[in-house]
């Protein structure tokens, strides 16, 4: 309980600093000013006719935190205004148009909300998610904008207090806290290139090395001597410290370089805590280590090429998972490789397929290498009855000892209005770590939950939520899960955005 209280106090102090800094920024102007050109910063606008987007011009202002997908408010994107006399970059997709109403987004001295180009190319910034991954462009972002000269700075933070209960001999109960504070800064150079910086910190290590009870979860180690089984490990204090540089080649093409220590390689879908289909779900997917467990890698370099709605990228990164020491930097090895192809066929869809060759991911099995294949489809759409987000993902791990393990995930969120969110997830995994000397096949989990948010102030909201999970696991004495394993969580959440 002492660690949980310390985590809450630390993160609330950090979030208070964010809000205090924002309150000192100049007042916003009236956002309803069609045709208004932003001083020194140029938005992505829509031009009539079939003409392709013009090349980027320097210093456009941006509306989101690339690589840090923020909770969407469930509201439809507002209408745009054509700006025929403005010679800034144009975009053909509706999701890349000028926006005038994104709740929680204060554009500081301009008073305007913009959908701007991404850090890695000439598409809408709302397409960017964790690392260099993509999400549907229609999924909105929110965050706090702070003016910083020629730089655009965005901040976001959240802290949750969770009461967890997992049934049976392999379960347990615990009260703990999870948290993240994220920052992004970007600048467009005179030649049209874009520089981006990102940082993400977490107070999770304060919960203790062993993490929290979660039936059927496995991966990494808590003490350096044994695998963590039926528990979810905490994230490292340092989740991301990265930089990116992109250069436009033409109206629709660009190349980019991304480096992080730690960072996220081009492997898997967006990390679960940033996925638009899982933003409000406090439970870590049990398929995490088949899909997106490499999202914290101590040493990543990614090079990529973007052509309109396609992105091809390759990463060289450290394959070893973070060790049990959650407050330090791990050794950078750059011994593993990943390739990913992403395609956004429409503003509502984001697809990816990726393949990773991972060297010695587990410190307890240093001679065991892994080939990982993932494929996923993420969907987001605003309807008259609310917004819907969903992800379908599959993952395969082929280990160098011949073991072959698969995982399947289907998750979603429904927001009937900005205050309520209902979320659900279904998963199936194959794992030898859950049963020493054998392999559990067909294990799975189905969870359902909801959260009610209350707006406290312009940049603050507080939520109350809960979920219930039904687990499917072998009932043999060696498995020891019992006949009907299940679990539940009750949680509170404070968000600065």
Segment roles from a protein language model:
Residues 159-167, 201-207, 261-265, 307-309, ...:
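Transmembrane beta-strands of outer-membrane beta-barrel pores
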Residues 21-158, 162, 171-172, 184-192, ...:
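N-terminal periplasmic/intermembrane-space "pro-region" immediately following the signal or transit peptide
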Residues 153, 191-195, 251-255, 309-313, ...:
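Repeated loop/turn-to-beta-strand initiation elements of outer-membrane beta-barrel proteins
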Residues 448, 482-497:
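Outer-membrane beta-barrel "beta-signal"
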Residues 355-364, 387-402, 406-413, 417-457, ...:
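Outer membrane beta-barrel transmembrane domains
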Residues 208-342:
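Surface-exposed coil loops of outer-membrane beta-barrel proteins
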Residues 146, 185-189, 247, 304-307, ...:
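Residue-level signature of outer-membrane beta-barrel architecture
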